[in-house]
Amino acid sequence: MKKKVKAVMPYIRKGIINFKMGPYEAWIKIGGQVAKPHYPCLKKIVGFFHNYELPSFGISNKEARLRFIEPINRKFDAFPDYCRYEIIPMIWDCWPCLDDRMSAWLKKHDVKTAIFTSRQNAERIQKRFPDMNILVVTEGVDTSKHHEGKLLKDRKIDFLEYGRTNKLVIGESDFEGINHLCTGNLKKRLTDEELEDAMADAKTTIVLTKNYTDPAIGADVETLTQRYWENMLSRIVMVGHAPQELVDLIGYNPVIEVPIGYNSEANFRNEVKNILEHIEDYQPLVDKNREMAVKLAPWNLRMQHVKEWLVGLGYDA
């Protein structure tokens, strides 16, 4: 009998958007089945199940659960389905420093099939579990949330920083002589809608993979995150570094690459200044980037691929 695969909605903390909702909602849109979540209702209990697991009993031979998991929260992200069902984890942020913990969890729950959002992370885990079915699906976005904005020459924000801190590469001081908006320095956190509007009104932004912004965690891993798609959809000139996953997927480098090393801060400031002085020259690039992102960024495409892959493995998805 084929096991029926049902996805479970990620846990939502009050006032915080869970990025893992993107693939879950896409799974529903493509006709994937879902199961009711059973998260604990008391906050104190939530904390307990981040650190401790319930025992397994009577694993179902009729159904499997597609769960959306970060290694640091692996126990809670799969709660409590690991007790009764085969878990098919879709895994984000499986950095090298977490390999031992993630591998122990995969072994404990006899995971046979897994999905990773990073090619390099998947390759390391595959070496530890050569018989495991592993699929790599890069991060996507809901393309409808990011509009193309104004032409570059008509935008008000010269340089936008948001998301990860970039101080290890470009320092902490503002770029002088331009309208530099760093969302991390604002007294009030921008809503998603406010950030999307800011992106649609920004000329340039910095994009870096985690191995540059947080090398202690990122190690040598560079991966395609949703931020690249969001910038491409918003037609912002991206300055920094593109992960090879993105270049391979779309067939060209959409980022203005800047040498990162001893003189990174000066390199970035000079490059941004040069781009702003010739901003209209970059309109064709950002137009192409948006066109490519509209075509290749949607979560629906990725989850359809996941669904077909699972069917090919013998699941009822």
Outline where the language-model segments fall.
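Nucleotide-sugar donor-binding catalytic core of glycosyltransferases
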Residues: K2-A64, I69-F79, P89-Y252, W299-M303, ...
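Generic C-terminal helix-cap and adjacent flexible tail
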Residues: V311-A317
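C-terminal "capping" alpha-helix adjacent to the active site of nucleotide-linked donor transferases
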Residues: Y262-E280
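Short, hydrophobic/aromatic alpha-helical segments in well-folded domains
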Residues: E194, R227, E271, K288-N289
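Acidic, glycine-centered active-site loop in nucleotide-sugar glycosyltransferases
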Residues: D248-P259, N270
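A charged, aromatic-enriched C-terminal amphipathic alpha-helix characteristic of glycosyltransferases
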Residues: L276-V311
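CheY-like receiver
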Residues: A198, E271-N274, W309
